[in-house]
Amino acid sequence: MAVNRRKGQAIHLDLSMPSYDRSDAGNTRTSGMAELIKIAAGFATIGQGAGPMMVTWKAGLFKKHGLDIEKPRIMGGAKGVVRGLMTGEIQFGNMAAPAPLRSNVKGEADLIFLTGGINQQFVMARPGITGREQLTGKKIGFVGDGGLNDALVSFIIEKLAEAGIEGLQKEPVPGGGDRQIAALVSGSCDAIVITPPESIEARRRGCSYVIDFAEYVLNYALGGIAARRDYVEKNPEITRRFIKAYVEGMHRYRTDRDFTVNVQAEYSGIADRTAAEETYDLTRPGMPPVPYPIVTSLQVLLDFMTKEVPEAKNVDARRFVDDHFIRELEDTGFIASLDESRK
């Protein structure tokens, strides 16, 4: 049973949208008695990582906190999110960490992570391989687009070699979960890095989970909400409202299974509801109640990145994190109040 996207669903990048990069006093509209500030947000691709942002939007929490955000945009990958942030097409973006870190250290962008997020990743093996020790001398799919997949493939090859599982080679595969699964099941490669809900479909087709990146403290630290540094500095109140709404949305995600599953099935185009339910049940445990950016994990990525991006050498990941908005919410009791409200 495939994790089918609904027919006719398209990824559309509207690069003609106006920039809303303005001061806190700027672009507003009135809705009833409340004045809403109009901004734009987006995420890299359809998948579990975008779940909290879509739950926040669907639950009306951005409006609750004074922001007018149209449906968050699919930006066509992390590089698209970086581009959208830098051009002002969007003001806040959800994405995995490698692309913005690479752009930052190369001097192409100045982005900061404001929260952590969900980005659960696994290595799955083709039918017939049930353990990581069987990957010696085998092939692992490699997309080659410079994104998170590439970083994690290179990372796991090195980590397995350190553990005595040597000779795992990169094998080019097309991007997209469905095509990667096809390559895996057909034997074109022996393993792939994959994320829910596609990993659930792979398991249904006889593939096995052999590595959970949680072992390396990476699953909830590979990305999150990012913005341009100068935008945050010029618009602290807008940023504060966005993060407050997002944190409340993450709480709704963690505590309201039915609502989250419905939203996930809708925005992902998953026709099989059980796949959305399994995705939720797989990602919910361990999801942090306070979504701080994890500096130590970002540092792991930066240090590993030095092999391909020399500019990353000796760079401190703390340069690319601003967690004071999250700390405010925790220190003022807002986050604790969300749990109280569910009792």
Model-derived features with residue positions:
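Glycine-rich, flexible loop/turn motifs
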Residues: 49, 58, 119-120, 131, ...
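Pocket-lining segment of extracytoplasmic ligand-binding domains
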Residues: 179-269
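Secondary-structure end/capping motifs
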Residues: 234-314
